[in-house]
């Protein structure tokens, strides 16, 4: 799990710089994104009002308050390690966005946009804050709630990102990069041990895991295990019964229980939910890829209305795709296999 977290974090960081290289440093990339901004004005009266409302209601301070509430809930549930790593992820993501935007990345002036300063706007600060809240929610969730948290977080982050695009606040690459920055930090938190728990047969969980994490990830642990390990069903024949038959019956009962446990079924449901989120993201990325190739090969025809709208649709589809895939990838770092070793009554 830790290695996969480090790999996902590095992959997100690499994709951010790829976005910058393709859509900011290259002239054609800037032309395509300028077309996407122009295309967002087509039919804007249908969505711009709702987008502005969302951006005004869920402002940067409001998003910060939301993150604080999520972290406080985590502390109240005694998920201290997860809450600490969530703080690291949120603070690191937002500081990284500001550093990337103002100090590390730059935007060559190809005389394409009307902005006099032609300032770099990658990544989007609003989308970073919204995605940070989503990542904090996922990090603080137990295994049985992470897929649901990913769906909620993806919807929130995508809505914020799309709103900045619809209102011409940001270009598509700005939004996509802002979706990746917090996920990179979330994956780094997992690599650092945010979701670690004692493995089956190893040392007992840390003190903080006796609270919320033990209740969610190891339900009924106190009933299933005693001082000497997992309880075995009592022999129906009493102390004088056949000890061999009793032992075999107990072993069969212990191996049958996990397959019918509601907790295990819940975990399976979460895996299915995460798979559906992945499929939605993959489908959106397929649409974005097909449209993007078509638009990229028509960079000289970007004054045509259909090409302008296709550029905008490409960016919107890519925002949905990356938002879903990034959240699903973070949840996929969960050690689902650990649940198979949980002996529940």
Describe the residue ranges of each PLM region.
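Hydrophobic alpha-helical bundle signature of multipass membrane enzymes
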Residues: 1-117, 138, 298-327, 331-341, ...
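Residue-identity detector for glycine
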Residues: 5, 14, 29, 39, ...
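Actinobacteria-biased recognition of intrinsically disordered, low-complexity terminal regions
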Residues: 1-8, 199-272, 325-345
């Amino acid at each position: 799990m830790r290695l996969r977290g480090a790999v996902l974090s590095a992959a997100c960081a690499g994709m951010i710089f790829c976005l910058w290289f393709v859509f900011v440093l290259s002239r054609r990339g800037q032309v395509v994104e300028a077309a996407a901004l122009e295309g967002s004005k087509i039919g804007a009266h249908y969505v711009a009002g709702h987008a502005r409302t969302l951006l005004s209601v869920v402002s940067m301070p409001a998003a910060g308050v939301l993150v604080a509430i999520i972290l406080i809930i985590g502390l109240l549930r005694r998920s201290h390690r997860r809450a600490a790593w969530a703080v690291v992820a949120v603070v690191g993501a937002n500081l990284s966005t500001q550093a990337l935007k103002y100090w590390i990345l730059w935007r060559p002036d190809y005389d394409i946009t009307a902005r006099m300063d032609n300032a770099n706007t990658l990544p989007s600060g609003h989308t970073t804050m919204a995605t940070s809240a989503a990542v904090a929610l996922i990090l603080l969730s137990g295994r049985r709630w992470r897929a649901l948290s990913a769906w909620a977080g993806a919807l929130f982050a995508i809505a914020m990102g799309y709103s900045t695009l619809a209102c011409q606040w940001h270009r598509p690459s700005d939004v996509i990069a802002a979706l990746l920055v917090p996920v990179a930090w979330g994956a780094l938190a997992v690599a650092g041990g945010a979701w670690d728990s004692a493995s089956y047969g190893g040392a007992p969980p840390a003190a903080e895991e006796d609270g919320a994490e033990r209740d969610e990830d190891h339900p009924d642990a106190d009933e299933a295990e005693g001082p000497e390990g997992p309880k075995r069903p009592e022999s129906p024949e009493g102390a004088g019964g056949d000890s061999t038959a009793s032992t075999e019956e107990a072993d069969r009962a212990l191996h049958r229980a996990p397959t019918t446990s509601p907790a295990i079924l819940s975990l399976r449901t979460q895996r299915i939910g995460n798979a559906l989120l992945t499929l939605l993201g993959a489908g959106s990325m397929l649409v974005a890829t097909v449209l993007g190739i078509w638009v990229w090969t028509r960079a000289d025809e970007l004054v045509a209305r259909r090409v302008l709208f296709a550029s905008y649709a490409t960016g919107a589809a890519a925002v949905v795709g990356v938002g879903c895939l990034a959240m699903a990838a973070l949840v996929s770092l969960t050690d689902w296999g650990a649940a198979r070793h949980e002996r529940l009554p």
